[in-house]
Amino acid sequence: MPALQEEHVVQLLRPLMRTRTVLEPVQNPPEAHTRERRGPHAAPPPQPAQPAATWECATTRFGGFPTAEEGETWPLCDGCADDLAFVAQVDHSRDGLHDRLPISFFTFFYCWNCHPWGRDSERGAWLVRSYTALRRPKVLVHGTEPDFEERHAVPRLEKSLPDAVGLHLHCRELWDLVPGDSGSPEAWANWHVVDRAALGLTQERARAPHMRNAAVAIGGYPYWANGGDETPVCTECTLPMELLLQIRPSELTDAMWGDVGTLYLFMCRIHTQQTGLRIQCT
């Protein structure tokens, strides 16, 4: 098989470039994000349209109690009828520094009894509630204490390209040139060329091979922890969904999926009520 030329790889990768927002843990909920925190490519933060007290209850957080619209109740699992556990919420309009999906806020709940992994039959064992705007938000308290300790994050903007297995979906031409389904020494040498080209485009710090897009993040491309690309397609338009939230093992959350598992939430950009869930473990 021919050796890949880095210049050609750059030409194939450049049109795939996206941005993503990495969520970094902080001790206390941030009151505001400076332009330096947001990164050199970010626009100034929008001013909240709601009072400060409303904004504080809707801040991005993992654990604690969720924010909900007035009248909403705590969700139940369709499988076991037990309460879903609140995992995270994201103030997408404020903390999403990337090319965001057209929602302003979302919450994520999960059933630890049924432990869904993304099969269609498990759809009622997890829930994403998304909002184009929060009109009458409130903190939805349930029980005496939350499922997980409340933790907070600040956003950081990064560039994002598909990882190695993601090229099978997003750039089949490059996948076939490597070729991606070969474990030969020549293919591994070609993967190193792809890695160098990707690092040059994203300016991401070098990690172990094929570890692009690691971290807890919203937007961009997923880092597939152990397996092929499992991006779900929208059942209405049949287009691949986009990454909404990726949760890797992190001090941001005590939630764990399997053996050092990574959870991925997806959403269709056109049909935002269409969402998907995947989990991969190392």
Residue ranges and their predicted role:
Residues 1-282:
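Preference for intrinsically disordered or flexible, low-complexity segments
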